[in-house]
Amino acid sequence: GMDQSASLRCRAGHALELDCRTGGVEQVPFDLAGAGLALLVIDTRAEHSLVDGQYGARRAACERAARLLGVELLADVPPGELDAHLGRLAGCGQAGAEELVRRTRHVVTEIDRTRRLVALLEDDRPLAGAKLEEVGALMSASHDSLRDDYECTCPELDVAVEAARAAGAHGARMTGGGFGGSAIALVDTGEADAVARAVVRAYAEAGFAAPAFLNALPSGPAGRLA
């Protein structure tokens, strides 16, 4: 799974690209420290609970959409053919068709965003300027899709992401399974505290409990300390 792979198969200064179909991984250059950047992890302190079946409901919707489209997985839908496939779902005449459209649009565009991000990180340009803007924009677009099409965020996650962006984060998004948990913001190292303070203020204004923070860098796998 994703969490296990991130814990055991990662490499310092790299992001881990995981193919969930095959279990294969690729190490992608992601030297944040060398670029003067950090990932600010924002623990929303919102209860991370999927017990009401929402996670399972989304998986079921994706599997149903794949069956209707005649593909094994929604990952098999080419991004260039997405609109045509969404039109088929919208016109299928079945209950919940609009939900299937949203879920499918998220899955296909999220895979495309991931591939575009990997291609960006693998090119030879420094992680700065236009390249950094593109990376941040892809992160933010991912959150917007998770919020609007996959509908797995929560108010605490959305406030954290919006506040981080407004305070100067290059990009921000929820991470993990959603419905609570944490968000991440790509920030200049020297601006991490200012972004964190902005999130704390936004939480206070919204009446949420104060969040917690961690400045993270891509690191090696878990191992024995002694």
Stretches with model-predicted labels:
Residues 180-186:
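Short beta-strand->loop micro-motif that forms the acidic, two-metal-ion catalytic signature
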Residues 12-171, 186-226:
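C-terminal nucleotide
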